[in-house]
Amino acid sequence: MTAPQTPNSFRTGPDERGRFGIFGGRFVAETLMPNILELERAYAEAKADPAFQAEMDSYLTHYVGRPSPLYFAERMSAHFGGAKIYFKREELNHTGSHKVNNVLGQILLARRMGKPRIIAETGAGQHGVATATLCARFGLKCVVYMGAVDVERQKPNVFRMKMLGAEVVPVQSGTRTLKDAMNEALRDWVTNVADTFYCIGTVAGPHPYPAMVRDFQAVIGRETKEQMLALEGRLPNSLVACIGGGSNAMGLFHPFLDDREVEIYGVEAAGRGVSTGLHAASLTGGRPGVLHGNRTYLLMNEDGQIADAHSISAGLDYPGIGPEHAWLHEMGRVTYLSATDQETLEAFRLCSLLEGIIPALEPAHALAKVAELAPTKPRDHLMVVNLSGRGDKDIPQVAEILGDAL
């Protein structure tokens, strides 16, 4: 097979059909096409409207609390003895993760489109909390679909969503995790097309969602560029972020894709090890297929059926990946690694002890690979890790796993 030709720019996708190379597109029921086309038109109009961007910027500053700091992790850098490690502190955003960046954009778009009812899927609950928060702020009805397994392991976030006025629907079908929550949300959308806006939480789904979510999250990378130039007078040498669907990673990576000298690493969830089959590493252990309206790398069994994903982290427990990541993987622009549950727990503990910051289990996957990458780099190597969420939501789960080991 001929290797794909390197493009002049990695930042021009998707094409007019919503594709990144062979990935992406929109594979949806005919009943959903009017919704999708309406959304595509509305987003194109909003993007071209300076008033929409000005409103979004105002809320990002005064409600979300941006810009988030770029923090030098001095003790962690000394501990590994190689790269100079910086954290992009997305966990300091209102609601505790990067998710709010995208939700704000979509909720402002829903208001612009006159949609009073918002539905969302959630895994770890962070996207659900962000959606419930902004629905409360703007007086919109909010319904969040969440796998029954995730409802159990993310109880603090379930309570938060209910406190914010959202209806949380536990999904009992399939593996009762994120994939199944997304299936139910899509079913709801087909049934309630007239008044409902589907707020997708990651860079997946049918076009225009992967590009739209990426655009709303790209504030992370734009700020990182400005902040690193101000702090160090140059761009970082490398970027590291965890990947489930991959929105926090795409938000950090996208503004740097054409800076060829910047190494970029995405970290998938290897669960109990890719060789065990109990993992969520779609690029490492999957192959191309179609799920939730787009073509991408998926975990599948021999019959082509979607396989169950496993991760200690509810937010990475998804059997696919955003189509732009699949394309960047095939183009070789981004290096995709994976971290096991055990490596992640160790990184979770180490970050807490060295920096006084308890990370979410999701970015702890990225930190697990920093532990391998940083010592191999020279001391003037600038490495940025996207600390995409805080660990409050994970404390009960980690306490149960570690028990008296703390």
From Swiss-Prot:
List the Gene Ontology MF annotations in alphabetical order. tryptophan synthase activity
Is Amino-acid biosynthesis there in the keyword field?
yes
The set of disulfide-linked cysteines is none
Q: Which reaction does it catalyse?
A: (1S,2R)-1-C-(indol-3-yl)glycerol 3-phosphate + L-serine = D-glyceraldehyde 3-phosphate + L-tryptophan + H2O
The entry's cellular-component GO terms read:
cytoplasm
**Enzymatic class:** lyase
Q: Which cofactor does it need?
A: pyridoxal 5'-phosphate
Give the EC number(s) under which this enzyme is classified: 4.2.1.20
State what this protein does. The beta subunit is responsible for the synthesis of L-tryptophan from indole and L-serine.
Q: Which family does it belong to?
A: Belongs to the TrpB family.
User: Would you tell me the protein name for this molecule?
Assistant: Tryptophan synthase beta chain
Gene name in the database record: trpB
